[in-house]
């Protein structure tokens, strides 16, 4: 397993450390597992070669990775993640499956690998990218002609319930700005065609405190780069406002599924 140290001085590096510390990620990340299952189901009918070359960005502990290796057992897989501890767990969780695989610590927003690949795929990682259009451009350049870039990321309606609480108390939302369907549709690189599908996943918590605790348990609590923490007193009032409901505090994950096919090779000839 290749373990270069990349991106530790920036926000992506802090995100990687958060996920690396999330010891219970594989057991607690139920939404991430559900989204990986859904993305894998959407890939079933995609016509890949019998022995495809596949790159996964942000493999985590291997939710999607297992689907990929089962779907294309003759493939060659490169599994990457910004967190070395996550990669170690992914390697362990795939140990019972036959097939060719490599593991590499890498910031998926700034790929340090060479293509071409038949499939570049990512589930619930791209929401951490600072420049999503630029990342899509870079990842699409790794595709073979007729290769696919497929991913699941978060959309603009994610945690809209918590956003409402923040607005009610004059507190900044503190989460990155996620794209809506139309905005993501405008990000597709030239040289191919893409489509976007969406889903809304409600997740019930006992309270706002339970919601924030769940984010910490899976390492997904890193705020946006410009966020300033609110006072403890204000946070207590905000959390109190989420208590007392008959069904606790439900938040929505707005998931965008993107599928881009490279229709021709516009890379320069060397």
Curated annotation (Swiss-Prot):
Group of enzyme by EC: transferase
Sorted UniProt keywords: Biotin biosynthesis, Methyltransferase, S-adenosyl-L-methionine, Transferase
MF annotations from Gene Ontology: carboxyl-O-methyltransferase activity; malonyl-CoA methyltransferase activity
Pathway(s) of this molecule: Cofactor biosynthesis; biotin biosynthesis
Keyword field contains Kinase: no
Reactions catalysed: malonyl-[ACP] + S-adenosyl-L-methionine = malonyl-[ACP] methyl ester + S-adenosyl-L-homocysteine
EC number: 2.1.1.197
GO biological process: biotin biosynthetic process; methylation
SUPFAM superfamilies the record matches: S-adenosyl-L-methionine-dependent methyltransferases
InterPro entries associated with the record: BioC, Malonyl-ACP_OMT, Methyltransf_12, SAM-dependent_MTases_sf
Superkingdom per UniProt: Bacteria
HAMAP family in alphabetical order: BioC
Family: Belongs to the methyltransferase superfamily.
Function, in words: Converts the free carboxyl group of a malonyl-thioester to its methyl ester by transfer of a methyl group from S-adenosyl-L-methionine (SAM). It allows to synthesize pimeloyl-ACP via the fatty acid synthetic pathway.
Protein name as it appears in the record: Malonyl-[acyl-carrier protein] O-methyltransferase
Organism: Magnetococcus marinus (strain ATCC BAA-1437 / JCM 17883 / MC-1)
């Amino acid at each position: 397993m290749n373990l270069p140290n990349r991106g530790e001085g920036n926000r992506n590096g802090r995100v990687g450390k958060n996920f690396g510390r999330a010891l219970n990620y594989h057991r607690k990340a139920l939404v991430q597992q559900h989204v990986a299952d859904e993305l894998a189901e959407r890939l079933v009918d995609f016509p890949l070669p019998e022995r495809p070359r596949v790159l996964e960005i942000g493999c985590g502990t291997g939710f999607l990775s297992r689907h990929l290796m089962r779907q294309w057992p003759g493939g060659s897989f490169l599994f990457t993640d910004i967190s070395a501890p996550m990669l170690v767990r992914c390697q362990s969780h795939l140990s019972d499956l036959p097939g060719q695989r490599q593991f590499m610590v890498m910031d998926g927003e700034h790929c340090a690998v060479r293509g071409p690949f038949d499939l570049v795929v990512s589930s619930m990682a791209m929401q951490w990218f600072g420049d999503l259009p630029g990342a899509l451009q870079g990842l699409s350049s790794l595709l073979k002609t007729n290769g696919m870039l497929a991913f699941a990321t978060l959309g603009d309606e994610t945690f809209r319930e918590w956003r409402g609480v923040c607005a009610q108390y004059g507190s900044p939302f503190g989460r990155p700005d996620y794209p809506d369907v139309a905005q993501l549709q405008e990000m597709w690189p030239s040289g191919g065609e893409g489509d976007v599908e969406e889903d809304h996943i409600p997740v019930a918590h006992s309270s706002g405190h339970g919601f924030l605790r769940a984010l910490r348990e899976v390492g997904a609590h890193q705020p946006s780069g410009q966020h300033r923490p609110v006072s403890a007193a204000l946070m207590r009032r905000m959390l109190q406002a989420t208590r007392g409901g008959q069904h606790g505090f439900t938040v929505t994950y707005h998931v965008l599924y993107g599928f881009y096919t490279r229709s021709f090779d516009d890379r320069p000839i060397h």
